[in-house]
Structure formats: C-alpha cells, structure tokens
C-alpha cells in the first residue's frame, strides 16, 4: 500500500480540531511516542534561562458558564459550534498552540473571565 503524502495532508486539512487531537493520541498510543516538543538540555550552571517564545493554551475545565466558554472557543479556533462544544466537553484539551505570550494571555483572560480554568504551557 503506497502512501500519498499530498492526499494525507488534504484529508488532515478537512479534519476538525477534535479529530486531529484524537489522531495524535492514537499515534502516540500505537507507536509509543509523545507529541510533546523535545525539551532543550540544561545550559551551563548559572546561565540565564531562555524566555519562552510560544505558548499553548490548555482548557482544564469549562467551569459553570459552559455556554460562554463554548462561544469563546468557537471564536478563537474558528471551529463550528458542534466542534467547539466537543472540544470543551473533552477538557482538559489544548485549544491553541504556538501563540505569542500576548495572544495566549489574552485568550486565557477571556476564558477565565467566564469561569473557565486555563493553563499556559
């Protein structure tokens, strides 16, 4: 069975965030790997720690205002209402990856304002 990379990429483009998240977990389980970014080795003793340049926003809990959280997730991710609901129901889940510190803090503040619990990674 020959794999056509372009075909696979096209199929992935049409997948929802929830479907892509499920795919990543299935690959991790099947191959015994992790999708986490590799951690840089510690520098020389006494060296200044490098500032983090990109952040992932993880929804830990929707809290009591679930409808408001779904609305914010829908707006932030561009997902359909149903996909946004599935994403919120699947918490804890990473909502957005690779955001700048300002973007990540802005999304975190919006979600926390309506009672959600959010962590930045």
UniProtKB/Swiss-Prot annotation:
Official protein name in the record: Large ribosomal subunit protein bL12
Keyword match Ribonucleoprotein: yes
Record-linked PANTHER family: 39S RIBOSOMAL PROTEIN L12, LARGE RIBOSOMAL SUBUNIT PROTEIN BL12M
Family classification: Belongs to the bacterial ribosomal protein bL12 family.
A Gene Ontology term for the protein's cellular component: cytosolic large ribosomal subunit
Name of the gene this protein is made from: rplL
Pfam families associated with the record: Ribosomal_L12, Ribosomal_L12_N
Subunit-level organization: Homodimer. Part of the ribosomal stalk of the 50S ribosomal subunit. Forms a multimeric L10(L12)X complex, where L10 forms an elongated spine to which 2 to 4 L12 dimers bind in a sequential fashion. Binds GTP-bound translation factors.
Species of origin: Lactobacillus delbrueckii subsp. bulgaricus (strain ATCC 11842 / DSM 20081 / BCRC 10696 / JCM 1002 / NBRC 13953 / NCIMB 11778 / NCTC 12712 / WDCM 00102 / Lb 14)
Ribonucleoprotein as UniProt keyword: yes
